[in-house]
Design a protein with these regions (language model features):
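C-terminal structured "cap/appendage" subdomains that terminate the fold
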Residues: 12, 40-46, 663-715
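Conserved "right-hand" nucleotidyltransferase catalytic core of DNA-directed polymerases
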Residues: 13-189, 208, 217, 245, ...
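Short, contiguous acidic/charged loop-to-helix segments that flank catalytic cores in large enzymes
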Residues: 44, 187, 191, 246-247, ...
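Short, basic/hydrophobic alpha-helical segments
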Residues: 195-211
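A short alpha->loop->secondary-structure connector
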Residues: 227-237, 251-257, 517-521
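Conserved beta-strand -> loop -> alpha-helix junction used to position metal-binding or nucleic-acid-contacting
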Residues: 232-248, 262, 527-531
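Conserved catalytic core of nucleic-acid polymerases
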Residues: 281-284, 332, 336-339, 394, ...
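C-terminal polymerase-core module
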Residues: 358-365, 369-422, 590-638, 642, ...
Length: 725
């Protein structure tokens, strides 16, 4: 008997199986009318051009086919390297790769830059040295001391920068030349290596000297690793991860992708030297000779990438400003925030976990009662049977396999009319809150610091927004009491308070600035309640006479239009007829013609350029703006309208972080930035500094840029994050 889901599916399809067998059976008794002697002769196939295929596979990044063709010909592909890294699974490269995990896009990006510096195509021309003695180390110390710019990278024992230990260091000062200094390889038969202490004592003066300029790929990680060993990295001049992000935010930014895209060069992946899956070993167990090829090329490729990407940025003043004045300095601020971490109340989270567990059990009982039978709430298959077969609810959409979908979008739509989906959504929300935060956060406390250390990624969102992971601070819900309880567990240490500084209606203010709409500018300039003012304009009444319901409608319209909401979306959001929603939108644009003009011009510019820009000149690429698919193209046009607002808000909060950190340092204050979430900065402030920091935050954040409308910041103080609002 075939058991489980496979058996169940077979039994349900018994009547159809004979037809299925007929469909998949290849007929060999067909009358072809003539005998086919040879497929090759019939199709007139020409011999494949193996050399041309080799070049094509290299250009397109078809790695498996490329390796097979190389093996067949006994050669390497043009530009293929003999060894380096995937910037993503090991140490310093890990967060670089994860941070650049955006899908490749189809927008009309600039043509690849042709590097002015010759790149050795033949692996034999590349000179990689493994530094195994003091004499070799001394030679390389002389070389990096004399170089104008040095590519630098670390190899480590862990993806977590707070616990990673150094295994080796790679350096490159010239095209085709690099070295690897192993200090921590441990395996049976490993050769003698220079001691970690002796290497760091020699490197420390150079690493900590701001006059010696360094370039790397995601140097934020390497800075953490060196701090684990008591070294504060200085002289960070360039970062190829950030260069790529500034140029083409919609592309991948890991080193494999960058080397392939810009250098036509294939790098060795981490799996090639360390294995993958359950068999993967730590880098400290990788044989030194393999590690040397991998890591030395990593530094060398970084140097090549910088020499390829930097001239493109240097040629455009606005991009150079984004890179030099925002991305490079904010990377340093983020590293310090990550290092500082945040204190959490583990006992409070444990209590909340227990409470959530009880609520989930109660909800599960209610769900089973509403369904008329018990079932596994975590099983999409069983849930689909309950919703669509037993209860007969309408199928909103289907999965790729053809089954009715039970995702959040579907349940949200069904919840408008049916009680069971509403209960399921509530159960899912609480279950995620419990597993992701109440249960997981205490396990993420670093035993050495007693704090939780999130990781901020700069190169993920095409808008310039930051993202965070382990834990993800951006997704903690704030609209529910349970979500707010999670924020209560982010606490201040004794003698300090949590201070939150949040930009008020920042995207609406940016819309007013960009659209130059007179009525919208006036509402902000006069300090009016902008939603009440909008309601007055739409309904043709004085703002003082606007009802709470009318203000709610106006608020939905204000924020909805920023995100390109259609009449259909507005109708669904407000629970009104589509014709009524269309009338509201028409009235809005009649009262705010500058907003409509801005939207129309932005769509046109996006189609012409393939990107839109922030107030500061950051380019926001739109991958699907020329898609043949109407829905995808429409989504890209909606994104084009919102991206300048989101992107400018991202630039403003980054500039604020830079300004606040400099002010704290210059003033010798003990207050510390500890989190950045959406449009909010969160600090740990000693009691004696509260008024000073409150005044400084307000002044710096409202004055970080001069827009056509004033910037406003709401500042709160409390013993925990929630009470600071």
């Amino acid at each position: 008997e075939v058991r489980g889901a496979v058996g169940e599916n077979l039994r349900r399809a018994l009547d159809w199986l004979p037809t299925a067998r007929t469909l998949v059976t290849i007929r060999t008794d067909c009358d072809l009318g003539e005998t086919v002697q040879s497929i090759d002769q019939s199709l007139d196939l020409k011999p494949e051009d193996e050399r041309l295929l080799l070049e094509l596979f290299a250009q397109c990044g078809f790695r498996t086919w490329l390796r097979e063709m190389e093996a067949r010909l006994g050669v390497s592909a043009p530009g293929a390297g003999s060894g380096s890294t995937q910037v993503g699974l090991e140490g310093a490269k890990a967060s670089g790769n994860m941070a650049g995990a955006a899908p490749e896009a189809t927008a009309r990006a600039p043509a690849p830059y042709v590097p002015a510096h010759p790149i050795p195509d033949d692996p034999a021309e590349r000179r990689y040295e493994t530094v195994m003695d003091e004499a070799a180390l001394a030679r390389w110390m002389d070389r990096i001391a004399a170089a104008d710019l040095v590519a630098f990278d670390t190899e480590t024992t862990s993806l977590d920068p707070m616990v990673a230990e150094l295994v080796g260091v790679s350096l490159s000062v010239e095209p085709g030349e690099a070295c690897y200094i192993p200090v921590g390889h441990r395996y049976a038969g490993a050769p003698d290596q220079l001691s970690l202490e002796s290497v760091l004592s020699r490197l420390r003066p150079w690493l900590e000297d701001p006059a010696h300029l360094k370039v790397g790929q995601n140097l934020k990680y390497d800075t953490h690793v060196l701090e684990n060993h008591g070294i504060r990295l200085a002289g960070i001049a360039h970062d190829t991860l950030l260069q790529s992000y500034v140029l083409e935010a919609h592309r991948n930014h890991d080193m494999d992708s960058l080397a392939s895209r810009h250098l036509n060069r294939r790098t060795i992946r981490y799996e090639d030297v360390a294995g993958k899956g359950a068999a993967q070993i730590g880098f400290e167990q990788v044989p030194v000779d393999q590690a040397a090829r991998y890591s030395a090329e990593d530094a060398e490729v970084t140097l090549h990438l910088h020499r390829t990407l930097w001239p493109r940025i240097e040629a455009e003043p606005t991009l150079q400003h984004i890179y030099r004045e925002i991305e490079i300095p904010v990377s340093r601020v983020l590293q310090r925030m990550e290092r500082q971490g945040v204190l959490i109340d583990a006992s409070a989270l444990a209590r909340q976990s227990d409470e959530l567990g009880r609520k989930l059990l109660e909800l599960e009982t209610r769900v089973h009662e509403a369904a008329g039978q018990p079932f596994n709430l975590g099983s999409p298959k069983q849930l689909g049977e309950i919703l669509f077969e037993r209860q007969g609810l309408p199928v909103i959409k289907k999965t790729a396999s053809g089954a009715p979908s039970t995702d959040e979008e579907v349940l949200t739509k069904l919840a408008e009319d049916f009680p069971l989906p509403r209960l399921l959504l509530e159960w899912r929300g609480l279950a995620k809150l419990k597993s992701t935060y109440a249960d997981k956060l205490p396990r993420m406390v670093n035993p050495r610091t007693g704090r939780v250390h999130t990781s901020y990624s700069q190169a993920v969102a095409v808008t310039g927004r930051l993202s965070s992971s382990e834990p993800n601070l951006q997704n903690i819900p704030i609209r529910t009491a349970e979500g707010r309880r999670i924020r209560e567990a982010f606490v201040a240490p004794q003698g300090c308070q949590i201070m939150s500084a949040d930009y008020s209606q920042i995207e609406l203010r940016i819309m007013a600035h960009l659209s130059d709409d007179a009525a919208l500018l006036r509402a902000f300039a006069e300090g009016m309640d902008v939603h009440r003012a909008t309601a007055g304009e739409i309904f043709g009444i004085a703002p003082a006479d606007v009802s709470s319901e009318q203000r709610r409608y106006a608020k939905v319209i204000n924020f909805g239009l920023i995100y390109g909401m259609s009449a259909y979306g507005l109708a669904a959001n407000l629970g009104i007829e589509r014709d009524a929603a269309r009338q509201y939108i028409d009235r809005y644009f009649a009262r705010y013609p500058g907003v409509r003009r801005f939207m129309d011009e932005t769509r046109l510019r996006a189609r012409e350029q393939g990107y839109v820009e922030t107030v500061f000149g950051r380019r926001l690429w739109l991958a699907e703006i020329h898609s043949p698919s109407g829905p995808r193209r429409a989504a890209a046009e909606r994104a084009a309208i919102n991206a300048p607002m989101q992107g400018t808000a991202a630039d403003l909060i980054k500039l604020s972080m830079i300004a606040v950190q400099k002010w704290l340092d210059d003033g010798g204050l003990a207050s510390r930035l500890i989190m950045q979430v959406h449009d909010e900065l969160v600090l740990e402030v000693p009691q004696a500094e509260i008024e000073t920091v409150r005044d400084g935050l307000s002044r710096l954040m409202t004055g970080v840029a001069q827009l056509k409308v004033p910037l406003e910041v709401g500042i709160g103080v409390g013993p925990n994050w929630e009470q600071a609002h």
